[in-house]
């Protein structure tokens, strides 16, 4: 039998995801077998579980924190927005249906049963399960249909922590309002409050602590300091709104990323941020970097249409003529071909559209979705690297270019054990792949960065691998959480 703990929030981006990761790492370091859990997540950022199922990247990252293989049971229901108020619903890792909100709520009981199945599985196999809620736990217009917050605590008999972000202001009002809008049966599940992202002397909060406990009969059990040095993957595209430049601001290597309207799996870029200056560009911006990344997207045809509308397609060809390096990942890779065939409008309202015509390749969209972990040998001219990643794509591609990767496991372009395309036009290198996570492979990432440095006659660099940096930050987070929160009322 597992002990269940739940972290709910007063709002989105209050710190739930990071707090769950920190608690998972803290408990596993104490010798327990720990699992993260989020009953329902909405995100275009997803990864592949050990069962070859699709789960949100947040629960994948939390599994890393817990030092366990990521499972479909950590995120039984995943909603992937497609536009026009429609989401693709993923249940236990596999596509279920495309649904709007009204259709989804009519099948709420079905999803609840799947959530219960996962709770039962986790209860039997772990010592602790740390649950993450979604958004605000008290959207009073949605409470009857909310299967992502305190309903889950009720089902799992979990003790709940309410976290609020003081950096936004109004933290005590947010806590008080949330508690007093909750039904009594859910209010009783709250065992403590945690205040996140505090800067300064904690003494200034003590009067507030006393008053909020007096008003709610629930104590503040922790205050987490604001720490800008932590490097952890972001959960969804809301985190990159307004974000323009990040990474190593002193690096001589500049990477531009097209900020697609339906950008997905942008955590693919994280491994480069230690070595490179990273810059998002809009469709009407100039390309100023050494490397241009066309990232994953939920709607490749929509992005291709926007690139044409704002003239980015022409700028990309100019960039190639100047010797630029281009890297397309999944949906971004598809746009590099001659044509994207979407007769059933499965990608959006654009339909079939001509591509950038960099690769001699045709991509056709259908109903089948590749969801799998993949590995193989990546070959560039006389260089070879062992690489691994994961695939999440609905299109299949017929490419007449040199394959980038020979797969030993995976689907790739066409299910023929070849993935991606590679082309060199004079001093310009163009790479394309369906493999997300490919930049987590240190040797290939190092090759890509040093390709730019060699063009500039600069010394090669070799930083710590991404996995090592991530693990170090998980341990740092765990220490902060353990020192900041009194768990005596929870554990």
Swiss-Prot record:
Q: In which pathway does it act?
A: Cofactor biosynthesis; adenosylcobalamin biosynthesis
* Gene3D superfamilies recorded: 3.40.50.880, P-loop containing nucleotide triphosphate hydrolases
Q: Which UniProt keywords apply?
A: Cobalamin biosynthesis, Glutamine amidotransferase
- Supply the Pfam families for this chain: CbiA, GATase_3
Q: Where is the GATase cobBQ-type domain?
A: 252-444
CDD domains in UniProt: CobQ_N, GATase1_CobQ
Note the SUPFAM superfamilies from the entry: Class I glutamine amidotransferase-like, P-loop containing nucleoside triphosphate hydrolases
> What domain of life is recorded for the organism?
Archaea
Record's keyword annotation contains DNA-binding: no
Q: List the active site.
A: 330, 436
**Gene Ontology biological-process entries:** cobalamin biosynthetic process
* Isomerase found in the keyword field: no
Any GO MF annotation of the entry: ABC-type vitamin B12 transporter activity
Name the family. Answer: Belongs to the CobB/CobQ family. CobQ subfamily.
Q: What does this protein do?
A: Catalyzes amidations at positions B, D, E, and G on adenosylcobyrinic A,C-diamide. NH(2) groups are provided by glutamine, and one molecule of ATP is hydrogenolyzed for each amidation.
The name this protein goes by in its record: Probable cobyric acid synthase
